[in-house]
């Protein structure tokens, strides 16, 4: 799933008044978390590059990267939809809906983390014995 596909899908499922840039930043925060907490903890994680998504007027000059692939692939890409829905609900002070959306996100995030753990070797830590 690409960044623009995730945002378009959320806009269809949960009409909202938040800008494309807001949702882009939220997706960047989540993929940064995925990279830092999950991917980097396993061998080969440093080979997978991640550049945060930023609005087109960002200083990095790369534009919004709307066609960039999100880090979690199918079938785990649903977590992005749940995450954006949760952020929208929280920002709208709809806390009951937020709790539901966040629980769905956490379940999807956990499923991705567990699958990544099964499929990749963990980094070993070097120990000094002196």
Where are these regions (language model features)?
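Conserved short "hinge" loops at termini or chain/domain junctions
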Residues: 1-69, 107-130
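Structural motif
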Residues: 69-78
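Hydrophobic alpha-helical segments
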Residues: 96-101, 120
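Short, charged, amphipathic alpha-helical segments
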Residues: 24-25, 99-103
């Amino acid at each position: 799933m690409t960044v623009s596909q995730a945002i378009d899908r959320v806009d269809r499922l949960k009409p909202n008044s938040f800008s494309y840039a807001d949702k882009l930043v939220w997706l960047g925060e989540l993929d940064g978390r995925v990279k830092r907490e999950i991917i980097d903890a396993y061998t080969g994680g440093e080979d997978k590059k991640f550049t945060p998504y930023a609005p087109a007027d960002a200083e990095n000059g790369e534009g919004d990267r709307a066609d960039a692939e999100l880090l979690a692939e199918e079938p785990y890409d649903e977590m992005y939809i749940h995450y954006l829905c949760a952020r929208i609900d929280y920002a709208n002070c709809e806390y009951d809906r937020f709790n539901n959306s966040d629980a769905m996100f956490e379940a999807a995030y956990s499923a991705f983390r567990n699958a990544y753990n099964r499929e990749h070797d963990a980094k070993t830590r070097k120990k000094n014995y002196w």
